[in-house]
Amino acid sequence: MKGILGVKVGMTRIFRDDRAVPVTVILAGPCPVVQRRTPEKDGYTAVQLGFLPQNPKRVNRPLKGHFAKAGVEPVRILREIRDFNPEGDTVTVEIFKPGERVDVTGTSKGRGFAGVMKRWNFAGGPDSHGAHKIHRHPGSIGNRKTPGRVYKGKKMAGHYGAERVTVMNLEVVDVIPEENLLLVKGAVPGPNGGLVIVRETKKAAK
């Protein structure tokens, strides 16, 4: 299952058949192959890819040995992609073609501590008719004797965002190899400049 590491550049639109298509621009690769996992040695097939060059002074000794063994320059990011055994020593954006479908994984924007209305779309309490200081409250979180407790997983206020999110089955609209750019239809998780992993989709289009 082929894949590549990239950085979300931002969103724009392109025109296709006189219609505007919203696309996310991803700067993908080139990613050097740092390590290969094999069923004989590791019990599974995978490839470890690197992305974004790193200052050698900021690399610790174990990683320096890891990069030297692979014969690659130090990189800032290392990620494994399972069931992928690419040819050659570098993975580029050319592994994808327009019209293919991909899954994009990233870290959603962190929004800090959020209440139930923002975090879970609760309606909140009434604004008037005697309502006092409950306008944005969740309401009851558990009855008296039954159940007499708060269920695990109850939707309440708390930390919102900054989670690993995968958006599936996005269409590759265009590939620009000379600039290492990948254009996918729709939105992908995370802020501009955030790390994303683009993989061949697990879900075929219906």
Swiss-Prot record:
Which SUPFAM superfamilies does this entry report, sorted A to Z? Answer: Translation proteins (SSF50447)
Per the record, the domain of life is: Bacteria
- Disulfide pattern: none
Where is it found, in Gene Ontology cellular component terms? cytosolic large ribosomal subunit
Fetch the InterPro entries from UniProt: Ribosomal_uL3, Ribosomal_uL3_bac/org-type, Ribosomal_uL3_CS, Transl_B-barrel_sf
Task: Specify whether Membrane is a keyword of the entry.
Answer: no
Q: Name one GO molecular function term.
A: rRNA binding
Assembly information from the UniProt record: Part of the 50S ribosomal subunit. Forms a cluster with proteins L14 and L19.
Q: What is this protein called?
A: Large ribosomal subunit protein uL3
| Species annotation | Thermus thermophilus (strain ATCC BAA-163 / DSM 7039 / HB27)
Q: Which gene encodes it?
A: rplC
